[in-house]
Amino acid sequence: MKKTRSTTLRRAWPSSDFSDRASDRMRSRSEKDYRLHKRFPAAFAPQASRGYMTSGDVSPISMSPISQSQFIPLGEILCLAISAMNSARKPVTQEALMEHLTTCFPGVPTPSQEILRHTLNTLVRERKIYPTPDGYFIVTPQTYFITPSLIRTNSKWYHLDERIPDRSQCTSPQPGTITPSASGCVRERTLPRNHCDSCHCCREDVHSTHAPTLQRKSAKDCKDPYCPPSLCQVPPTEKSKSTVNFSYKTETLSKPKDSEKQSKKFGLKLFRLSFKKDKTKQLANFSAQFPPEEWPLRDEDTPATIPREVEMEIIRRINPDLTVENVMRHTALMKKLEEEKAQRSKAGSSAHHSGRSKKSRTHRKSHGKSRSHSKTRVSKGDPSDGSHLDIPGGREYDFCDPLSRVPREGCFLIEHKGDNFIMHSNTNVLESHFPMTPEWDVSGELAKRRTEMPFPEPSRGSSHSKVHRSHSHTQDRRSRNERSNKAKERSRSMDNSKGPLGASSLGTPEDLAEGCSQDDQTPSQSYVDDSTLRPAQTVGHQRAHIASTSYKEVCIPEIVSGSKEPSSACSLLEPGKPPESLPSYGELNSCPTKTATDDYFQCNTSSETVLTAPSPLGKNKEDHDTLTLAEGVKKLSPSDRQVPHSSREPVGHKEESPKGPGGGPAASGGVAEGIANGRLVQHHGAEPSSLDKRKEIFSKDTLFKPLHSTLSVNSYHKSSLSLLKSHPKTPADTLPGRCEKLEPSLGTSAAQATPASQRQQESGGNQETSFDYYNVSDDDESEEGANKNTEEEKNREDVGTMQWLLEREKERDLQRKFEKNLTLLAPKETDSSSNQRATHSARLDSMDSSSITVDSGFNSPRTRESLASNTSSIVESNRRQNPALSPAHGGAGPAFNFRASADPPTNEAEKLQKPSNCLQASVTSV
């Protein structure tokens, strides 16, 4: 038996190659093989294996029992036969298969019916073939049309082969080549039991598991549709028959019928169940209603009948922020925007035309920056981000503060009269905007801003500083220059209505016209070293609006430093709401709104640097100052300088409408003292500082508003502009560091830093002046100013910050002298305007010093103002020189403005004290 078993394991059969079998035997190393090799030499082993006649090898090995259908597993042969018959379009039945096997494999014993059925069932379970009423079909001929070589190397098939060949030999033992039938019978009796048992277990399990699979497979088979349960049942029946036969009756087939019946029932049941399940699944797939009932659109015929809640839910999903209230608010805001845009277009059409290209450039550049900032206070609207022309309306939406946002646009209507841009306070617009939530009221306003800002903010906020940036050769420089120019142009537009002071602060209509005319007439001038100035003037028209914003910003400094004072500044400014006092009114509006509006406007005006000026109060401005101390000094200082001039001037302007934008005489007086003090620190004389500041302011006014001292404005603008240009531009690059250094240096060398800072502030404030000078004198000496600025920038950049500050201070002293002369020459440059300018200078200085000289340790308003002036000058020059210092770069500027202009004291002493407050505020913010 051992031998027989070993032979069976080897599965040698008569037709097989004996040499191959011997090699197999050597590889398998069965007991028989081991004995064979042991007894006979290796050379003799092949012979013994071939003949199987060796005494030790052949006689006991009954080779006949190993009646494999073929060397290839029967299942594979059946697959090949079925595939061939399918290709020949012959129906494949068990009888046909038997015939085919007999014909195609004449040397191979034909399997019995039972083995054939069993093998076919196994193949069906294995999904290699599928039964149909027309016969068996190969499932995937490409996959299962396996060549004998593949089958040989397929252990799986060898395993099947082990089972199937044994079955075949059991059921139909072939007369072995040299095998006695007895051995075959013995093996038949013995092996079939085990084999059949294994087959039975296998088959039942496989059948149960695969019956549904078989059905599916057959259904899936492309050749035939779903096999009816009966069809499918037939192969299972065969399978179960064979399975049961072998499993229950291995030795004899006496009980095959019973077992077959059982297996039939079982198989039929399984197939039916599986088929039903499949059908149920299919039905389930298509039985569902579409669209599902839970879908909101229940009535397709009447879609208008969508439930309100469903519709709202859909809308919410589409746009969570979209609500009826928001939509209404957005619609109202858009209407207001359109109106404001129309007003702005009317007022600043020429300004828009002249500054459109520059504005677009600056808009793009500063829009990105301001957007990043405005993202923090998008709702507040980043006036600095948008051009101020756009900002007035944009700010209204951005800030939604009737006073802050709207006053700028609504309160100040820029009219281009002749060459002058006159800022008219549009009380109605202002009032119409007043109902709007203050910009600092973010809760309701934020949504509005979200809806509004997308449209107005870019044009407003971003246009404002963008215009500045685009105008300056570099975005930042442009931003600084444009801020200064915007503030100046605002002051100019205000000065048209108010006075040289207001004009210089906001930009007189002349300056606006000059900005337009110069921008339009002399692009090269506008692109002079401080091309931003030109653009600022071009933007000056925009700044006319911006000027109103600047006036608001002017008030903003006061409000920022002393949030209490916005009302005073506003009250001072409010009396003069006529176009002349519009700057005052703008300042007035900006004062009340400056708490928040000034945050935004001043930040925007100063440099968009205080893009984050979210706080409606001076604290935020102080924070902004702190945030953008260097930059704020750089950026805000120019704007703030302008703004302080404007804010301080508006009072004087109100008192003497031709004067400063929003300073008012009281503001002028306060500023005069503040400037005197600040400039005493700078110039060591309140009068020199105030006068210098007034010069600066007035020269600005004269620049913007030659009415007062047009004579010396141009000549002085040229000289002081050159100085200012050189100063602002020279420190532009060094300004950031210098402004930062300025605080320590201010602390260490207040006088030194003060002259330099004052120079810078004058450059910054006078940069506005010098920007205005550039605007006014750029026509005469745009190239000269540009060259001077470039040379001075280079020199000052090379020279130390303190040296540059000293140089700038000297130049500012000269400028202040010029401005004094201009102030004296200017008819509007009365004491009130001088006070306004001094106050403006003091505010600017105090704003700058409050931010920059926070650590200076100087509490005197003069020192603060001088430091602020220095800071402003540095900031302005840095802005001109270094675009990186542009408002977008620093947010400290607005803080300076806020503090400086937050003091709306009516008298110089009060304003000087307020610069101290500004300094303190800046210290707190810093």
UniProtKB/Swiss-Prot annotation:
Domain of life of the source: Eukaryota
Biased composition (Polar residues): 518-529, 746-772, 847-884, 914-926
Example GO biological process: regulation of transcription by RNA polymerase II
Biased composition (Basic residues): 353-378, 463-472
Region ranges (Disordered): 1-32, 338-394, 452-529, 632-693, 724-803, 825-926
GO cellular component terms attached to this protein's record: cytoplasm; nucleus
InterPro entries linked to this entry: Storkhead-box_winged-helix (IPR019391), STOX1/2 (IPR040126)
Positions in coiled-coil regions: none
Composition-biased stretches (Basic and acidic residues): 18-32, 379-394, 473-495, 632-658, 684-693, 785-799
A Pfam entry, by short name: Stork_head
Gene Ontology molecular function terms on file: RNA polymerase II transcription regulatory region sequence-specific DNA binding
UniProt protein name: Storkhead-box protein 2
Annotated organism of origin: Macaca fascicularis (Crab-eating macaque)
The encoding gene: STOX2
